[in-house]
Swiss-Prot record:
Keywords: Developmental protein, Glycoprotein, Membrane, Transmembrane, Transmembrane helix
Domain SSD: 430-624
Pfam families for the chain: Sterol-sensing (PF12349)
Protein known as: Protein dispatched
GO biological process: germ cell migration; patched ligand maturation; segment polarity determination; smoothened signaling pathway; wing disc pattern formation
SUPFAM superfamilies recorded: Multidrug efflux transporter AcrB transmembrane domain
Deleted gene: phenotype: Death during embryogenesis with a strong segment-polarity phenotype.
PROSITE patterns, alphabetized: SSD (PS50156)
UniProt entry tagged with the keyword Glycoprotein: yes
InterPro entries the record matches: Dispatched_Hh_regulator (IPR052081), HMGCR/SNAP/NPC1-like_SSD (IPR053958), SSD (IPR000731)
Family: Belongs to the dispatched family.
Region Disordered: start-end pairs: 99-135
Length: 1218
């Protein structure tokens, strides 16, 4: 805010100095009120789906995808469009029947009135019961499957009989019932939820069931003595319900990937030692305390079902109850079976139902209990066995456990983490529990302690820098208030409904920015105090006398005066820093990706609110500190104060040596630094723009955790197993081409809300019934088949190009001699193409309906989409035009149909891929050809557009384009700020060159670290500009404001004053980012790495490259300096600059606080630069015109209340001034 250098702001300085409590309380009340309103009126952010918002909106492809989504939503059974006209007619008939029933309630005969009423009542009760127990029915089906038995017992079976291998015994002696009586408990319609019965039962029926269960259990225990020898005995007893509860592994169950470790890590898992180690490992998995609460139990006991694993299948094959009993012969037996049956599995002659449905073309031993299929498909990697090779090598094996994937497994996952699933030979390297989003949501909150730790470190740095715990506390509160205010403006004022988790990354950034502003303000405050004491001295270090009162001073040194000077410099300096950073964030709003757009707005708003608090809350807090801690100074300092002073002296000496070393290296070796950093910048540019380049992501899966996390390892290994390959291998999935007419490619939804897709907009010019349109559609379908991207598809594809099917439909005879009814089909018969519009509109719905009635027809998305039009009378039908048609009539009126949209679909010969270049070539070739075709289309069909499976490609294309746009906008904003505040074209060019090379080096380092241009990386690149430009901005401005216009002297002047604060800012922000690298989630780690890299690179380039450039070719004596009339006028008003002078100190109690007293003691020590802007002086002395102006409205009795005499002996510290 440049207005702080204006005389009109004196009232504000007066308020800060005289009424700081009022300012602090007012701001606190306002901030707390805003935060409460935001939390009460707005829902708390939901991070259950971290990838929500990672989509493109507003682009050409994005609008088409949104319109396509809205079209699909509108064509479902609840929308206004229908692919099958019969569905629309059926709904119309139902609605009319409902109306007629209400208009004529007594049309039925009275004799059936009570009968129908009772029947309707029973039907209603049955429907209600069916609805209530729909979920239970699914469980009962599985339950009955496990308890299945033959429909009637064999006559030669005894009373106690084991039927089948399902584990169900029937006790005819006790129950004395039919074969189905023993299954009576399974027919209950109880409401069962995870083993809890929530309904009431009849007492007698309950007692009977209990007796039945007891008798059944008695027989189960007796059955333990039944013979179990022989593989051919299919009726042998298995534990309760079979070895695996009569079920097979499925993807919906939790599963673990096992790998061999140890000295024999390269050996195959498929040997006796490997299987025994896996057996032990699965026991570790199932023995955690909470496992029994989540596992799928056997239906008749509380025992958990066995895990589906390779050792368990080997034990079942060997007819052993435990996998610990396996021998080498058992492993060999399984090996022989798998080798002999592999060819049938590889040739797709087996599936998961071979033991139930006799359709598998494989030998019986290969189908028995699905051992072969389950082992090869689920439990071993796809390279385990190779065709025509008797050698097997198993690198990865899978263990499935009977625990369904759910977000409720988080406690169980933590127990597995504590157990460490590993033994001497094998370990679990990956797992899939369906917990990715839930765990990420938890870690997003639990890792906040890292943010707090980083904030604590920054606040500790502020404490050491300021020496005031009060200022440190108020600075921390200011940062918290800035976040709360930003959320208020984001959610309430700007009405953003979506809050992505990436917005939380702004917390890390604002901690560093807020601390930098505190450093800046306190630095200027210290320098102002130092300059005042050095100019108003009556005591030397060799003599000591009483300090004079304020009445005896020639110039009254008021708190208001000090505040005015500090604010005039600090407010403008903080404004420049905040402007560049907020501008870089707001530039991200130009992105078409929802999450990036929201992050840019929130992060930019946080920076703005932080700036507002730093020019209101922080000055008032400093004013309170000067009042609150003003005490009488004593010459007898306690030991703690002496230690602090000694520590400060050591730090001061180190800083002095550090600054002198850097200054001498730049002044003496400027050409060497230019050569080194210039070469690094050129090399970085090659890395960024040529090789390897900033690669686009090639995985649609967005990584949430570190690469070594079990969930992320599973994402990289899952394609090693056959059951995952159909979902991940796209070699058989070809890109579909959807050509759409009748719908505008418009997205009128909220681009900042991923749940808002707007409405479907129709093309009013669309009309497919005209003769030119019919001819063009037919020619278009024929032209598509001649293109190189078209794939010839076998089978019936009737709806893909509906016009061809309609032509065949219209060729039929009007009266078929083979039809006994001899129904006249006019006008939909014996017609010549192209058809008359009214005939086309009338017959098209019939043609489509007949096609849907075909048994071999499989409905898709292609074809015309019908909507209901206003009902017309019979005599109005001949006057209908456009896309209207009619099919049936009731009460003498027609129900016309409108062809509101048209979709023509073909399959291309391009396989789906996540590689950007491949899909880009496909999209551009099809799009270019289609646009050329539309130029020859009649006007009513020129509004068509093409779309396909382009969602991920759209994100890739947007990232590559929008990131470049955001960089250009941020760089342009930075250049504008530099021109405005340096007022020198050459300095601005040098600074922009430095920032550009800093960005190149930052991005190059990130590329070498393996980063790809994904969502977070795009944000990081644009944010780096705002963070990197600050250091260059400070160096450039102070070079321009140097009191000496000669190049070498100006360079040395800047280095002696800027190095310290920039090092402090870079260190605090970089270390705060370094702390975030200890997080468990990837976004926190990446933002930490980014902050560390950008701080190091930008500081080194600003200090060594820019200052070396200014040392060698910097402007001097006003060369290429812009002349602004207003600034020239201000510059002529003052020409005094801050100079160090020997310390002769005079002070009043108002200024002798922990802050000011430290300044007194360090008056002769090294004083860094002032972050001043737009002024010809770094610190103006309060004398003459400025002093009189600042005190014009201040009553002199204001100072009298703070007057106290002090006597102290000060020690002179060595100065670092040259």
């Amino acid at each position: 805010m440049l207005c702080f250098d204006s005389e009109r702001m004196n009232w504000y300085y007066h308020v800060l100095a005289r009424r700081p409590y009022l300012v602090v309380v007012s701001i606190a009340v306002y901030c707390v009120a805003c935060i409460i309103v935001a939390l009460v009126l707005n829902k708390l952010p939901d991070f259950s789906d971290p990838t929500l918002g990672f989509e493109t909106r507003g682009t050409k492809i994005g609008e088409r995808l949104t319109a396509w989504y809205n079209l699909l939503q509108e064509t479902d059974h609840h929308g206004a469009l229908f692919s099958n006209p019969s569905d629309l007619w059926e709904r119309r008939r139902v609605e009319q029947g409902y109306v007629e029933t209400k208009l004529h309630p007594n049309h039925r005969r009275r004799k059936n009135k009570h009968k129908n009423r009772n029947k309707n009542k029973r039907r209603k009760e049955q429907n209600q019961s069916s609805h209530e127990h729909h979920d239970v029915a699914q469980k009962m089906m599985q339950f009955k499957k496990r308890l299945k038995a033959t429909s009637s017992p064999s006559p030669n079976l005894g009373f106690d009989t084991w039927i089948g291998d399902s584990g169900v015994f029937r006790d005819y002696e006790i129950t004395n019932d039919s074969a189905s009586s023993s299954l009576e408990p399974t027919r209950r319609t109880e409401q069962i939820e995870y083993g809890h019965n929530t309904t009431s039962v009849d007492e007698e029926e309950h007692q009977q069931r209990v007796q039945t269960k007891k008798s059944t259990w008695r027989l189960l225990k007796q059955a333990a003595t039944l013979p179990t020898d022989g593989w051919a005995d299919m009726h042998r007893r298995q534990p309760i319900e079979g070895f695996f509860c009569d079920s097979s592994p499925r993807k919906e169950y939790s599963h673990f990937v096992v790998q061999r470790i140890g000295p024999n890590a390269t050996d195959s898992l498929f040997d006796l030692n490997g299987l025994l180690a896996m057996c032990q490992l699965q026991d570790q998995i199932t023995e955690v305390p909470s496992y029994r609460a989540f596992c799928e139990p056997e239906m008749l006991t509380t025992e958990c079902c066995r895990p589906w694993s390779l050792p368990n299948y080997a034990a079942m094959l060997a007819n052993k109850s435990s996998c610990f009993d396996l021998t080498t012969e058992d492993v060999t037996s399984l090996h022989t079976l798998l080798l002999g049956c592999y060819e049938y599995f590889h040739d797709l002659k087996m599936d998961n139902h071979c033991n139930e449905i006799p359709h598998c073309r494989a030998p019986e031993e290969c189908k028995r209990l699905n051992i072969v299929f389950n082992v090869l498909n689920f439990l071993t990697d796809f390279s385990f066995i190779k065709s025509n090779d008797s050698n097997v090598y198993l690198k990865y094996a899978m263990i499935f456990i009977p625990v369904a994937q759910s977000n409720r497994l988080l406690p169980l996952f933590h127990e597995w983490e504590d157990v460490e699933l590993i033994n001497e030979l094998v370990e679990v390297v990956a797992m899939d529990l369906g917990l990715e989003n839930e765990l990420f949501n938890e870690l997003l909150l639990t890792d906040v302690w890292l943010v707090s730790l980083g904030g604590t470190f920054v606040m500790a740095s502020v404490w050491l820098y300021t020496g005031s715990a009060f200022i440190t506390l108020m600075s921390c509160v200011a940062i918290c208030f800035s976040l709360g205010l930003a959320y208020f403006f984001y959610a309430i004022v700007l009405e953003f409904e979506f809050f992505p988790y990436m917005n939380l990354l702004a917390v890390v950034v604002i901690i560093g920015i807020g601390a930098d502003d505190v450093f800046l303000f306190l630095k200027i405050w210290h320098c102002v105090l130092t300059e005042r004491f050095s100019n108003r001295c009556t005591l030397t270090t060799q003599s000591q006398s009483a300090l004079p009162t304020l009445e005896n001073s020639d110039h009254t040194e008021s708190l208001e005066n000090i505040m005015a000077l500090t604010m005039r410099h600090a407010a403008a300096s903080m404004f420049v820093t905040s402007l560049t950073t907020a501008g870089a964030f707001y530039a991200s709003y130009s992105s078409s990706i929802t999450a990036i757009k929201c992050f840019g707005i929130f992060a930019g708003t946080v920076v703005v609110t932080n700036y507002l608090l730093m020019i209101t809350w922080l000055p008032a807090s400093v004013s309170i500190m000067e009042r609150l801690f003003a005490t009488r100074m004593s010459c007898h300092h306690p030991m703690s104060i002496k230690l602090i002073h000694a520590c400060k002296k050591s730090i001061n000496r180190f800083c002095q040596m550090f600054e002198e070393c850097i200054t001498k290296s730049i002044m003496n070796y400027a050409y060497l630094w230019l050569l080194i950093f210039g070469a690094l910048g050129a090399s970085s540019a090659v890395i960024v723009f040529w090789y390897p380049g900033l690669q686009l992501p090639e995985k649609s899966h967005f990584q949430l955790f570190v690469s070594k996390h079990p969930f992320e390892v599973y994402s990289s290994l899952k394609q090693q197993f056959w059951f995952e390959k159909p979902l991940q291998a796209y070699e058989n999935f070809k890109m579909h081409m959807h050509f759409v007419w009748g719908v505008q490619a418009v997205d009128d939804g909220d681009y900042t809300n991923p749940n808002s897709y707007g409405h479907l907009h129709y093309d009013n010019n669309f009309n497919v019934s005209s003769r030119p349109a019919q001819l063009w559609i037919l020619d278009f379908c024929q032209s598509v088949r001649q293109q190189p991207f078209y794939k010839e598809t076998l089978g019936m594809l009737l709806p893909n190009c509906f016009i061809e099917n309609l032509i065949d439909y219209m060729k039929r005879r009007c009266i078929d001699d083979m039809d006994s009814t001899r129904k006249d089909r006019s006008p939909c018969c014996d017609a010549q193409f192209p058809f008359e519009p009214h005939i086309f509109e009338y017959c098209l719905p019939q043609s489509i309906s007949n096609m849907y009635d075909t048994t071999f027809f499989r409905p898709g998305v292609a074809g015309p989409k019908f909507a209901e039009a206003p009902r017309l009378e019979t005599e109005d039908y001949l006057g209908m035009s456009g896309n209207e048609s009619a099919e049936y009539s009731t009460n003498g009126s027609f129900t016309p149909l409108l062809v509101k949209a048209l979709v023509i679909e073909f399959e291309s010969n391009v396989a789906y891929s996540t590689i950007y270049a491949n899909i880009r070539q496909f999209y551009e070739s099809v799009e270019h050809w289609f646009q050329m075709q539309l130029k020859t289309a009649p006007p009513e069909l020129q509004g068509g557009w093409f779309t396909s499976d382009l969602k991920f490609y759209n994100v890739q294309d947007t990232l590559s384009h929008d990131t470049f746009v955001a960089i250009c906008l941020a760089m342009a904003a930075s250049l504008a700020v530099l021109l405005c505040f340096t007022v020198n074209i050459l300095i601005s060019i040098y600074a922009v060159l430095t920032v550009s090379l800093s960005i190149f080096n930052t991005v190059a380092v990130l590329i070498l670290l393996g980063w790809q241009l994904n969502i977070l990386e795009s944000i990081a690149v644009s944010t780096a500009i705002g963070l990197a430009v600050d250091f260059s901005l400070h160096y450039g401005i102070h070079y321009r404001m140097s009191p000496v216009k000669e190049r070498l002297a100006a360079t040395q002047f800047v280095l002696s004053r800027i190095i310290g604060p920039t090092v402090m800012a870079a260190t605090t922000t970089g270390l705060a980012g370094g702390i975030m690298m200890a997080s468990n989630i990837l976004p926190y780690i990446q933002i930490g790495v980014f902050l560390v890299v950008v701080m190091i690179v930008s500081w080194f380039y600003a200090t060594f490259f820019l200052m070396s450039l200014l040392r060698v070719a910097g402007p001097q004596h006003g060369f290429l300096e812009l002349k602004w009339p207003l600034w020239s006028k201000r510059s002529s008003g003052s020409s005094k600059f801050y100079e160090r002078k020997p310390s002769q100190v005079i002070a009043s109690e108002q200024l002798l606080t922990p802050t000011s007293s430290a300044i007194v003691e360090l008056a002769n020590s090294e004083t860094h630069e002032l972050e001043s802007l737009n002024s010809n002086s770094l610190i103006k002395t309060i004398s003459g015109i400025e002093s009189a102006h600042a005190l014009s409205s201040l009553p002199r009795d204001f100072e009298h209340s703070f007057q106290t005499m002090h006597e102290c002996k000060y020690q002179t510290y060595p100065s670092t001034s040259n």
